[in-house]
UniProtKB/Swiss-Prot annotation:
Full protein name: Chromosome partition protein MukB
Protein's job: Plays a central role in chromosome condensation, segregation and cell cycle progression. Functions as a homodimer, which is essential for chromosome partition. Involved in negative DNA supercoiling in vivo, and by this means organize and compact chromosomes. May achieve or facilitate chromosome segregation by condensation DNA from both sides of a centrally located replisome during cell division.
Any matching Pfam family: SbcC_Walker_B
Binding residues for ATP: 34-41
Gene field: mukB
Region Flexible hinge: start-end pairs: 666-783
GO terms, molecular function: ATP binding; DNA binding
Taxonomic source organism: Erwinia tasmaniensis (strain DSM 17950 / CFBP 7177 / CIP 109463 / NCPPB 4357 / Et1/99)
Length: 1483
C-alpha cells in the first residue's frame, strides 16, 4: 500500500519571537500550547504562508486592524516579522520518500502601507541529517548566528552537487511543484483555485461551520464535468457552423451568377486597363529607348563634329598664328629689304665721306707739318728773343752793380765784405759748406771740369735735337694711323701694334675676297633650310591628321599603304550598295512575317491559356492532339473507378456511424430499448454501474460478464416476473441480475482468471471461457476510447468521401473542358509558338536594323577614311620630294657655320674698306715708329736740362772764380789794382750790352714777322680741322646709323632680301587661302553643330519627358505589379492576348466592362466607392485595388472551408462542383449532429446519479464521527424541483416542444433555456442571455442542492447550522466537512497526479479550548483513520495525551524578546527533549 506523504517539520527564521526555530510535526496531531501572545498564531501563520504565499489571500484576523480590507493595509503578517530577511520553511517527505523543503523568504518593506515581500523557493535532495535551521542560518559565534539572504542561500546550494535549489517567480509554478510532489491535494492553477484552498485552510483554522464553504459545497465537492460540457459546446458549435455553412451555400448559390458576372466584368475592366498600361509602358519605353539611342547617336555625332570643329579650330588657330607670324615675317622681310636698300644708300654716303676724309686727312697732315715747322721756328725765335732779353737784363744788372762798387772811396771793409759775400754765395751755389779761400781754387777746377762736361753734353743734345726735328712729323703721322686702325695704344707699343696690324691686314684681305662666294652659299643654304622647315611643318600637319608619329624615312611605305587602303575602300564602297540592298529586302520580309504572326498570336495564346489550364488540372504535359484524345478516354475510365470507390467509402462510413451511434447511447447500452426497459423495471444497466471502470480493467469485466454485460440490475427479480409476460419490444437475449445497484459487486460469479481470459463457473456442469476482447467496450473509458478511434476513422472516411466526390465532379468538368477545347482550339493549339517566333523575328529585325545602321555608319566611316587617305596621299605627294631635306640633319649646322664664316668675311671686308687707305700709308713709314714718338720731347727736356745744368755749372764756376778772384780782398786792399780792373770790366760790360740790345731788336723783328706767318698757317689748319671734324662726325653718324640698321649691305643683299620677301608673300597668300577655306568649313561645321545642338535639345527634352513619363509610370507600375503579385492576381490580369490589341480597343473594352460593373455593384457601397475611385485614369493602381477589393469581397462571401482554394475565380469554378454535394452532405451531417433532448436528459441524470453515489461513499466515512451530542454527519444531495421537471419534459414530453429544438435559429443551449423559461415562468432570469442560461443548464451541478446534516440527540437529522450546534459540535462538524472536501479533491486529482503518490493531508485548528477532551479524542481518532495531520493551538491548561505538544512561553531577556519552546510527546509521558534549545540571539 502506498504510504501517505507527511510534513516533517516547520522552520521559522527571524519571526517575532522566533529567530531560528524548527518544530518537528507529529504524524497525527501537533499541539501548540501556550498563553495569550505566546506565538501560537504566529507559528500557524508561518505554516500557512509557506503553503499559500499569496498576499491577496493571507489575512490573519486575530492580529489585523479591525475592518481593514484594503490590500495596501497590513493583513497581520507584517507585525509577525522582524526586520531583515525572514524564512518560513516546510520539511516534507512524500510517498516516494523524497525529502523536499518548500518555503518562502519574507522581508518587510519600509513604508506606511506595511507591505511584505515574499519569494517562494524549494530545496530538493537535501540529506536527512541536515536540519533546515542549519541551511538557513550561518553561525557567527557560539551564541550568535546570521540569517542568510536568498542569494547566498542559492550560492550555497550551487556548491553542493546533490542538492537542487529552485526559486519561483510565480505562485502558480510553486504550487505546481507542490502538487506534483504530493504536498497539496489539488492542482492550484488559478487564483480562484488558490482562494478555495485558502478558504478551506481558513475555515479549518478558525473552526466552526464555514458559511463560505457550505454555500459553495458544489464547487468544492462536485467536479466540473468539463468533457460533457465541452462535448455539448463542440456539438453546438459544429451545428452552428454547419447551419451557417448551409446558409452560406444557399446565399452563394443565389449569388453565383452575380459573382461570375462580377469577376468576369472586373477582370475585363482591370485587365484591359492593365494590359493597356503595360502596352503603353512598353511603347513609351521603346520610344524612350529609341530617343535615347537617337540621343546617344546625336551626341556621338556632336562629339565627332565637336572634335572636327576643334581640329579645324585648332588648325585655324595654327593658320591664324602662322598668318600672324607670316605677316610678321613678311613685314620683317619688307622692312629688311627697305633696310638693305637704306643700308646700300648709307654705304654709298659712307664711302663718299670716307674718300673726302681721306683727302682732308692728307691735306691736314701736310698743313700740320707746315704749322709744326712754323711753330718750331716761332719757338726758336721766341727762345732767341727771350735769351736776348735775359742777356740785356743781366748785363744791365751787372753794369749797375759794378757802377755801385766803383766808389774808390769804399773802405777795405766793404771790399772784404763783398769777398765774404762772394764766398758765401759760392758756398750756397755750389752747396759746399767747407769752401774756403784756401781750397777755392781746387773747387774751382772741379766745377770748371763739370762745366766743360755739361757743355759737351749740351752740344751732343743739340746735335740730336737737330736729327729729331727732321723725323718728328713722320712719327706723328705713323702713330696717328696706328691709333686710327688699332685704337688707342701706347707710344712705346705703336711699332709692334702697327706691325701686327699690317700682318693681319693680309688675312683680312683674304677673307674679304671670300665674301661673295660665302654670301651665295648662305643664300643657298638658307633657302634649303626654309624648305626643310616647310617640309617639317607639312610632316607635322600630316602626323596630326594621320593620328600617329611618322618618320620621314617611312613616308614612301606609308604612301603605298594609303594607296592600297584607297583601293580597298573603293572596293568596300562598291560592295556597300549591294549589302545595303540585301539588308533592306530582309528587313521588309521580317516585317511582313512579324505582322502575320502578330495577327495569329492572340488565337494561339487563348488556346494555350486553355491548354495550360487543362495541363494544370491534369498535371500532365499535353504536347499533341493525340494525347488530348487519349487523356479524354482516361478521364472516362477514372470517373468510373472513382465513382465505384466513392460508393464503397460511403457504405463504410454509414457502418461506422451506426457503431458510433450505438456506442454513444447513455449508460453504455448498445440498444436504446435497454434504457426504456431499465426505467420500466426500476433497475440500472450493468454498464452504468461499471461506467467508471478504468480502461485497463475494462477487458477483464467485459470477459467476466460475457453476454450478460448488457444486463439490467434490479433490486428484486420476483417483482418484475409479471412484467416479462407479453414483453416483445426487447432484444433477443435479455439478462436480468438481482442486486443492490448502490453496492453491486462481482461476487455473484465464481471466477478463475487466466492469462488474458477468465473461466466463469456458472454451475458444476456449466463453465464459460471468455477471452479478453481486443477492443473492450465495457465502461465509459473504453467506450470513449473506441468512440475516438471510430470518430477518427469516420473523419478519415468523410474526408476521403469528400475528396472522391470532388474528384468525380472535377473529372466530369474536366471532360467537358476537354470537349470544348477540342471543338474550338485544337486546330491552333499545337502549332509553334508565334510569340517565340516573334521574339526571334524581332530580335533578327533589331539585328538587321542595327546591322543596317552599323553598315551606314561604317560606310560613312569608310568615306571619311577614303577622304582622309586621299588627303594623306596629297600631302605625301608634297612631302616626298623633300624627304632628302627632312633627312639632312647637318643642314642647320652647315648653315650656321657658313653664317659664321660670312660674318667673319663681312667683318674683314668692313675692316679693309674702313682701314685700307690707312694701312697703305702706314706700311712705308712704319719704321719711324721704332723711335718712341715721346723721345723728341724727352730729348728736348734733356736738352733743356743739360742747358740748365751747363748754366748752373757755369754759375758755380763763376761763383768760385769770383771767390778766387776776391781772394786778395781777404788781405789788404789794393785800391789801384781794384780801380783799374773795374774800369776794364765796365767797358766790356757796356760793349756786351750794346751787342745784346742789337741782338734783341733783331730777334723781336724776326719774331713778329714769323708770328704773322704762323697765324696764317694756323688759320688754314683750323679751317682744315673744322672741315675734317664735320665730315668725320658725319661719317660717325652714318656708321652709327649703319650699325643701328644692323644690315651688312653688299651687292647681293638686296636681291636676297627681295627674294625672301617674295617667298614669304607667297606663303602668306597660301595661308590666307587655307584660312579662308577653314573659316568657311568652320562656319558650316558650327551651323551643323547648332542644328545638332537644337536637335539634341529637342531630343533631350523629348527623352527627358519620355523618361519622366516612363519613371513616373514605372513608379506607379511597380506599385501595380507589387499589388498584383502580393495578391496573386497577375495570372488573371496579365492576359497576353490583349497585348495585341490597340489602345482604343482596350479602352473601349474597359469602358464597356465599367458600365456593366456600375450596375453590378450598385447595391454594394464599398465596391461602388472603390469603383468610383478606380475610374481615375492617372491612378491605375486604384483599378488593381478595385480588383483586389472584388477578390476580397468574393473571398468573404465564399466559405474557404467549403471551397479549397484562395482564388475566387477557381472557387466559382469549383463551386458548381461542390455546392450540391456539400448541401447533401451537410444536411446529413446536421441530422447526425442533432442532439436529442432525451439523450441530454439521460446524460445529465446519469451524471447526477454517479455523483450521488460518490457522495454516499464519502458519507460512509463520516458515519462514525461524533462530537458532543452529534452522533453522525452526512451530506444530503437533492435535485431541484424546477430542474427535475425540465429533465422529465426532456425525456418524456420532448415532442411537444420540437418548435424549439428543430429551429435553425436557435442553438440547443438557447432552446434549452427557452424551455426552462416556458416551464418556470415565475423565475426571474435577470439580464442573462438564453445562451448563458442554456450553458448553465447543461452543467449538472446546477441541478443539485447540497446541505450538511447532523444527527444530534433526540432531534434526529438536522441541518447543520452554527446556531443549532454548540461551539465544539460546530468545530467538529466543520472539520469533518473539510476532511470530506480534501478526500474529494484527492480522488478528483488522482488522474492528474501519479498513481504512486498519496498527497499530504493537514488541517489547522486555532483556539482548541472550545473542544472538550472527548471531542479532541474523537478528532485524534479521525486523523488516525484518515491518515491526516492536524495542528491545533490550545491554552496552557490543555495537554492532549496523544501526539506532540509544544509548550510556548514568550520571554524577554536582555531587551530581546523570544519564545521559549519545550516539546512533549503525549501528556502522561515525561517531558521530552526540546527540538531545539532556546532561540539564539540575533546577529
Amino acid at each position: 500500500m502506498i504510504e501517505r506523504g507527511k510534513f516533517r517539520s516547520l522552520t521559522l527564521i527571524n519571526w517575532n519571537g522566533f529567530f531560528a526555530r524548527t518544530f518537528d510535526l507529529d504524524e497525527l496531531v501537533t499541539t501548540l500550547s501556550g498563553g495569550n501572545g505566546a506565538g501560537k498564531s504566529t507559528t500557524m501563520a508561518a505554516f500557512i504562508t509557506a503553503l499559500i504565499p499569496d498576499l491577496t489571500l493571507l489575512h490573519f484576523r486575530n492580529t489585523t486592524e479591525a475592518g481593514a480590507t484594503s490590500g495596501s493595509r497590513d493583513k497581520g503578517l507584517h507585525g509577525k516579522l522582524r526586520p531583515g530577511v525572514c524564512y518560513a520553511a516546510l520539511d516534507v517527505v512524500n510517498s516516494l520518500h523524497q525529502r523536499v523543503i518548500v518555503g518562502v523568504r519574507l522581508q518587510q518593506i519600509a513604508g506606511r502601507d506595511r507591505k511584505v515581500d515574499i519569494k517562494p523557493f524549494s530545496i530538493h535532495g537535501l540529506p536527512t541529517a541536515i536540519n533546515p535551521t542549519e541551511i538557513l542560518t550561518e553561525s557567527v559565534s557560539a551564541r550568535h548566528a546570521r540569517v542568510l539572504p536568498l542569494s547566498e542561500l542559492k550560492e550555497k546550494f550551487e556548491a553542493m552537487e546533490s542538492v537542487q535549489f529552485k526559486q519561483y517567480n510565480s505562485i502558480t509554478d510553486y504550487h505546481s511543484v507542490m502538487f506534483d510532489l504530493g504536498i497539496v491535494a489539488r492542482r492550484l492553477r488559478t487564483a480562484a483555485d488558490r482562494s478555495k484552498y485558502y478558504r478551506l485552510i481558513e475555515a479549518s483554522l478558525y473552526g466552526g461551520i464555514s458559511s463560505a464553504i457550505t454555500r459553495s459545497l458544489r464547487d468544492y465537492l462536485l467536479p466540473e464535468n468539463g468533457g460533457v460540457r465541452k462535448a455539448f459546446q463542440d456539438m453546438e458549435a459544429a451545428l452552428r457552423e454547419n447551419r451557417m455553412t448551409l446558409e452560406a451555400i444557399r446565399v452563394t448559390q443565389s449569388d453565383r451568377d452575380l459573382f461570375k458576372h462580377l469577376i468576369s466584368e472586373a477582370t475585363n475592366y482591370v485587365s484591359a486597363d492593365y494590359m493597356r498600361h503595360a502596352n503603353e509602358r512598353r511603347i513609351h519605353l521603346d520610344a524612350a529607348l529609341l530617343l535615347r539611342n537617337e540621343l546617344f547617336t546625336s551626341r556621338k555625332q556632336r562629339a565627332s563634329e565637336q572634335y572636327r570643329h576643334i581640329e579645324m579650330a585648332r588648325e585655324l588657330a595654327e593658320h591664324n598664328a602662322a598668318e600672324s607670324d607670316l605677316e610678321t615675317d613678311y613685314q620683317g622681310a619688307s622692312d629688311h629689304l627697305n633696310l638693305v636698300q637704306t643700308a646700300l644708300r648709307q654705304q654709298e654716303k659712307i664711302d663718299r665721306y670716307d674718300a673726302d676724309l681721306e683727302e682732308l686727312t692728307f691735306r691736314l697732315e701736310e698743313q700740320n707739318e707746315v704749322v709744326a715747322e712754323a711753330r718750331e721756328v716761332q719757338e726758336d725765335n721766341e727762345a732767341r728773343s727771350e735769351a736776348a732779353e735775359l742777356e740785356v737784363d743781366e748785363l744791365k744788372s751787372q753794369l749797375a752793380d759794378y757802377q755801385q762798387a766803383l766808389d774808390v772811396q769804399q773802405t777795405r771793409a766793404i771790399q772784404y765784405q763783398q769777398a765774404l759775400q762772394a764766398l758765401q754765395r759760392a758756398q750756397d751755389i755750389c752747396q759746399l759748406r767747407d769752401l774756403s779761400v784756401d781750397n777755392a781754387e781746387e773747387w774751382q777746377e772741379t766745377f770748371q771740369a763739370k762745366e766743360l762736361e755739361a757743355t759737351d753734353k749740351l752740344l751732343m743734345l743739340e746735335q740730336k735735337m737737330s736729327v729729331a726735328q727732321a723725323a718728328h712729323s713722320q712719327f706723328e703721322q705713323a702713330y696717328e694711323l696706328v691709333t686710327r686702325i688699332a685704337g688707342p695704344v701706347s707710344r712705346s707699343d705703336a711699332w709692334q701694334v702697327g706691325r701686327d696690324v699690317l700682318r693681319d691686314a693680309g688675312n683680312q684681305r683674304y677673307h674679304a675676297e671670300q665674301l661673295e662666294p660665302l654670301r651665295s652659299r648662305v643664300s643657298e643654304l638658307g633657302q634649303r633650310l626654309r624648305e626643310q622647315q616647310d617640309a617639317e611643318r607639312l610632316l607635322s600637319d600630316f602626323c596630326k591628321r594621320y593620328g600617329q608619329q611618322v618618320d620621314a624615312a617611312d613616308l614612301e611605305n606609308l604612301q603605298a599603304e594609303l594607296e592600297a587602303q584607297i583601293e580597298l575602300l573603293n572596293e568596300s564602297v562598291a560592295d556597300a550598295g549591294e549589302r545595303r540592298m540585301t539588308l533592306r529586302q530582309e528587313l521588309e520580309q521580317l516585317r511582313e512575317r512579324i505582322a502575320r504572326l502578330t495577327k495569329q498570336a492572340p488565337q494561339w495564346l487563348a488556346a494555350q491559356e486553355i491548354l495550360s489550364q487543362l495541363g494544370e488540372q491534369t498535371g500532365q504535359a499535353l504536347e499533341n492532339s493525340q494525347q488530348v484524345t487519349e487523356f479524354m478516354q482516361q478521364l472516362l475510365e477514372r470517373e468510373r473507378e472513382t465513382t465505384v470507390e466513392r460508393d464503397d467509402i460511403a457504405a463504410r462510413k454509414r457502418e461506422i456511424e451506426r457503431q458510433i451511434e450505438r456506442l454513444s447511447q447513455p449508460g453504455g447500452s448498445e440498444d436504446a430499448r435497454l434504457n426504456h426497459l431499465a426505467e420500466r423495471f426500476g433497475g440500472v444497466l450493468l454498464s452504468e454501474i461499471y461506467d467508471d471502470v478504468t480502461i485497463d480493467d475494462a477487458p477483464y469485466f467485459s470477459a467476466l460478464y460475457g453476454p450478460a454485460r448488457h444486463a439490467i440490475v434490479v433490486p428484486d427479480l420476483s417483482l418484475i416476473r409479471e412484467q416479462l409476460d407479453g414483453l416483445d419490444d426487447c432484444p433477443e437475449d435479455l439478462y436480468l441480475i438481482e442486486g443492490d445497484p448502490q453496492s453491486f459487486d462481482d461476487s455473484v460469479f465464481n471466477v478463475e482468471e487466466l492469462a488474458k481470459a477468465v473461466v466463469v463457473k456458472a454451475g458444476d456442469r456449466q463453465w464459460r471461457y471468455s477471452r479478453f476482447p481486443k477492443v473492450p467496450l465495457f465502461g465509459r473509458a473504453a467506450r470513449e476510447n473506441q468512440l475516438e478511434v471510430l470518430r477518427a476513422e469516420r473523419e478519415t472516411l468523410a474526408e476521403r468521401f469528400a475528396t472522391l466526390s470532388f474528384d468525380v465532379q472535377k473529372i466530369q468538368r474536366l471532360h467537358q473542358s476537354f470537349s470544348r477545347f477540342i471543338g474550338s482550339h485544337i486546330g491552333v493549339a499545337f502549332e509553334p509558338d508565334p510569340e517565340a517566333a516573334l521574339r526571334q523575328l524581332n530580335g533578327r529585325r533589331n539585328e538587321v536594323e542595327r546591322e543596317l545602321n552599323n553598315h551606314e555608319s561604317e560606310n560613312q566611316q569608310q568615306r571619311q577614311q577614303y577622304e582622309q587617305a586621299k588627303e594623306g596621299v596629297s600631302q605625301l605627294n608634297r612631302l616626298l620630294p623633300r624627304v632628302s631635306l627632312l633627312l639632312d640633319d647637318t643642314l642647320q649646322d652647315r648653315h650656321e657655320e657658313i653664317q659664321e664664316r660670312l660674318a667673319e668675311a663681312q667683318e674683314a671686308t668692313r675692316f679693309v674698306q674702313q682701314h685700307g687707305a690707312q694701312l697703305a700709308r702706314l706700311e712705308p713709314i712704319l719704321a719711324v715708329l721704332q723711335s718712341d714718338p715721346e723721345q723728341h720731347e724727352q730729348l728736348t727736356l734733356d736738352y733743356q736740362q743739360a742747358q740748365q745744368q751747363q748754366r748752373d755749372a757755369r754759375q758755380q764756376a763763376f761763383a768760385l772764380t769770383e771767390v778766387v778772384q776776391r781772394r786778395a780782398h781777404f788781405g789788404y786792399i789794393d785800391s789801384a789794382g781794384m780801380l783799374n780792373g773795374t774800369s776794364d770790366l765796365n767797358e766790356k760790360l757796356r760793349q756786351r750790352l750794346e751787342q745784346a740790345e742789337a741782338e734783341r731788336a733783331r730777334a723781336r723783328e724776326q719774331l713778329r714777322q714769323h708770328q704773322s706767318q704762323l697765324t696764317q698757317y694756323s688759320q688754314v689748319l683750323a679751317s682744315l680741322k673744322s672741315s675734317f671734324d664735320a665730315k668725320r662726325d658725319m661719317l660717325k653718324e652714318l656708321q652709327q646709323e649703319m650699325q643701328d640698321i644692323g644690315v651688312h649691305a653688299d651687292a647681293s643683299a638686296e636681291q636676297r632680301a627681295r627674294l625672301r620677301r617674295d617667298e614669304l608673300y607667297g606663303a602668306l597668300s597660301n595661308n590666307r587661302a587655307r584660312r579662308n577655306q577653314l573659316e568657311k568649313q568652320l562656319t558650316f561645321c558650327e551651323a551643323e553643330m547648332d542644328a545638332l545642338q537644337k536637335k539634341l535639345r529637342r531630343l533631350e527634352r523629348d527623352y527627358q519627358q519620355g523618361r519622366e513619363q516612363v519613371v513616373s509610370a514605372k513608379a506607379g507600375w511597380v506599385t501595380v505589379l507589387r499589388m498584383v503579385k502580393d495578391n496573386g492576381v497577375e495570372r488573371r490580369l496579365h492576359r497576353r492576348e490583349l497585348a495585341y490589341l490597340g489602345g482604343d480597343e482596350l479602352r473601349s473594352m474597359s469602358d464597356k466592362a465599367l458600365g456593366a460593373l456600375r450596375l453590378a455593384v450598385a447595391d454594394n457601397e464599398h465596391l461602388r466607392d472603390v469603383l468610383r475611385l478606380s475610374e481615375d485614369p492617372k491612378r491605375p493602381e486604384r483599378k488593381i485595388q478595385f480588383y483586389i477589393a472584388v477578390y476580397q469581397h468574393l473571398r468573404e462571401r465564399i466559405r474557404q472551408d467549403i471551397i479549397r482554394t484562395d482564388d475566387p475565380v477557381e472557387a466559382i469554378e469549383q463551386m458548381e462542383i461542390e455546392l450540391n454535394r456539400l448541401t447533401e452532405e451537410l444536411t446529413a451531417r446536421e441530422q447526425t449532429l442533432a442532439i436529442s433532448s432525451r439523450s441530454v436528459s439521460n446524460i445529465i441524470r446519469k451524471t447526477i446519479q454517479r455523483e450521488q453515489n460518490r457522495i454516499r461513499q464519502l458519507n460512509q466515512g463520516l458515519q462514525a464521527v461524533s462530537f458532543g451530542q452529534v452522533k453522525s454527519v452526512r451530506l444530503n444531495v437533492n435535485v431541484r424541483e424546477a430542474h427535475s421537471t425540465l429533465l422529465d419534459v426532456l425525456s418524456e414530453q420532448h415532442e411537444q416542444h420540437q418548435d424549439l429544438f428543430k429551429s435553425n435559429r436557435l442553438t440547443f443551449s438557447e432552446a434549452l433555456a427557452k424551455l426552462y423559461q416556458r416551464l418556470n415562468p415565475q423565475i426571474d432570469m435577470g439580464q442573462r442571455t438564453p445562451q448563458t442560461i442554456g450553458e448553465e443548464l447543461l452543467d449538472y451541478r446546477n441541478y443539485l442542492e447540497m446541505e450538511v446534516e447532523v444527527s444530534r440527540g433526540s432531534d434526529g437529522w438536522l441541518r447543520a447550522e452554527s446556531g443549532a450546534l454548540s461551539t465544539g459540535e460546530a468545530i467538529g462538524t466543520g472539520m469533518s466537512i473539510l476532511v470530506m472536501v480534501v478526500q474529494s479533491w484527492e480522488e478528483e486529482s488522482r488522474r492528474l497526479r501519479g498513481k504512486d503518490i498519496s498527497p499530504c493531508r493537514l488541517l489547522f485548528l486555532d483556539e482548541a479550548a472550545r473542544l472538550d477532551a472527548k471531542s479532541i479524542a474523537t478528532l485524534f481518532e479521525l486523523c488516525d483513520r484518515l491518515e491526516m495531520q492536524l495542528i491545533i493551538a490550545a491554552p496552557e491548561n490543555i495537554s492532549p495525551e496523544k501526539g506532540t505538544t509544544y509548550k510556548l512561553v514568550r520571554k524577554v531577556f536582555n531587551n530581546t524578546e523570544h519564545v521559549h519552546v519545550v516539546g512533549l510527546r503525549g501528556f502522561s509521558a515525561e517531558p521530552g527533549a526540546a527540538t531545539g534549545s532556546a532561540d539564539v540571539g540575533a546577529h
